[in-house]
């Protein structure tokens, strides 16, 4: 009797696909109105500040904070992610944005996460405001914070253009990256 690995591989892929499908369907709907986005952004910042005290310090000195409270990422060989958020200046929403990314390669699953980008310089704010769509990794330098880096960061040691914090990760998919994500200004629904 000849045995192959194809059967177990198909089973694992099917389980991953079903799990990913269930997670995407169970995930909260992408916010569509300004009020919904504002509410989700407020909740996300409270959670981020509780999880990463360094974010509180950056909030005090950042020129602007771009917050995407719920980004959905899913894929099976070909993947994508999408989320909507707001740019805050001095605690008030001044514009709305979406984040979109596509990927391909060895991947299977789905996850949701949020991220906040602290724009520390006028140049970073100008770049965001003047671009027709900003691809992360092109333009101002972005430092994605991990726990170790966040512990040593203070408002006086923050010298980069943009600091990003990823938070609230849920799901079954390896890795989160912001590189290549395109951020574009939107007009949310009423």
Where are these regions (language model features)?
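N-terminal secretory signal peptides that target proteins for export/translocation
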Residues: 1-7
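C-terminal segment of classical bacterial N-terminal signal peptides
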Residues: 15-28
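Small-residue-enriched, tightly packed secondary-structure blocks
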Residues: 27-190
